[in-house]
């Protein structure tokens, strides 16, 4: 499982 959360 891969999670990507951008800081913008």
Curated annotation (Swiss-Prot):
The keyword Secreted applies. InterPro entries: Adipokinetic_hormone_CS. The modification Pyrrolidone carboxylic acid is found at residue 1. PROSITE patterns: AKH. The keyword Coiled coil does not apply. GO terms for cellular component: extracellular region. It is found in: Secreted. This hormone adapts the animal to light backgrounds by stimulating concentration of the pigment of its red body-chromatophores. The modification Tryptophan amide is found at residue 8. This is Red pigment-concentrating hormone. Belongs to the AKH/HRTH/RPCH family. Keywords: Amidation, Hormone, Pigment, Pyrrolidone carboxylic acid, Secreted. It comes from Penaeus merguiensis. GO terms for molecular function: hormone activity; pigment binding. It comes from the Eukaryota.
């Amino acid at each position: 499982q891969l999670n990507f959360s951008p800081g913008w």
